[in-house]
Curated annotation (Swiss-Prot):
Belongs to the HPrK/P family. Its EC number is 2.7.11.-, 2.7.4.-. This is HPr kinase/phosphorylase. InterPro entries: HPr(Ser)_kin/Pase, Hpr_kin/Pase_C, Hpr_kin/Pase_Hpr_N, P-loop_NTPase, Ser_kin/Pase_Hpr-like_N_sf. Its cofactor is Mg(2+). GO terms for molecular function: ATP binding; magnesium ion binding; phosphorelay sensor kinase activity; protein serine/threonine kinase activity; protein serine/threonine/tyrosine kinase activity. SUPFAM superfamilies: HprK N-terminal domain-like, PEP carboxykinase-like.
Amino acid sequence: MPKVRTKDIMEQFHLELVSGEEGINRPITISDLSRPGIEMAGYFTYYPKERVQLLGKTELSFFEQLPERERKQRMMSLCTDITPAIILSRDREVPKELIEASNENGVPVLRSSLKTTRLSSRLTNFLESKLAPTTAIHGVLVDVYGVGVLLIGKSGVGKSETALELVKRGHRLVADDCVEIRQEDQDTLVGSAPELIEHLLEIRGLGIINVMTLFGAGAVRSYKRITIVMNLELWEQGKQYDRLGLEEEKMRIIDTDVPKLTIPVRPGRNLAVIIEVAAMNFRLKRMGHNAAEQFTSKLADVIEDNGQDE
C-alpha cells in the first residue's frame, strides 16, 4: 500500500500549519474524509478517527454555540492518537480549544482558503489516486488513437519493436518493459512507467533509446488509462484463432476485467498496423458499430432466405 503522510497534503494544497507540528508525519491510510458534525454534538460512538477531519462553516458555527466546558471536551475527543489531521476551510479562525487539544495530542491542525466542498473534492481525488491499489506487469503501454493499449507476451516476441513502430507512426509511448498500474476507480486502471525507465525503450541489438529525446515530447505520455490488452504470441500451427471477432476475452488486473485480444505473431505480419486497426475497431464497438455482429446478422438473414426459397 502506498504511503501518504500529512505533510504530503500540506505541500500539495499549500495548507497553513496552525498547531500540532509534531504530527505532520502521521500516515493517512484511507481516502475518505470525515466532517464531524454529529461528533460536535457529542456523539462519538462511530467516530471515524482514522480519517482526515474537515471542519467547515456549519461545524464551527455550531461549535461556537456550545458551553465552554463542552467545547474543550469535544476537541479533546476529536484529537486522537491516530487522527492524521484536522483541516479548516475558508480561512476560518481556529478555536483556542482546538489548538490546545492538537498540541497536547500531536494532531496537526491545518487551514485552507478553499470552500469546504471544493477542498473536500480535491482532497478525496488526491488521496484516492495516491492510495489506489497497485501492481506491476511485464509489458508495454502505448496510447494509440486515444486508446490505452497494453501489449503483453513472452520476452522476445516483439513488444518493444512494435511500440517503436507505433511511435514512428505518431502514437505515444507510456511505459516499456515494466508497467506500474493503479486502480483509481472500480473500472479504471491507469498505467505509468517507473521513474527510472520513464521514456526509455529497449530494442534488442540496438540497446536503450530515449524516445522523448529522439522523437520529441509529443511521442511520450506520463500515464494513460488502460482500455484494452493485446497479447502477442508466436503463431502456433493448428491453434484456432478468432477470425470473426465475436469472442471477447477478458484479463483481470487487480479487481478490474479488461478486454483482451490475442494476436498471433509471424514473419510478414505488420503488427503496428494490426494494433492501430484493433484500437480503432475497439472505439467503433464502444460507439455501437460492431462489424462482426453486423456480418453475422446478415449471414443469418441470407441463410434464412435461402432456406425459405427451397
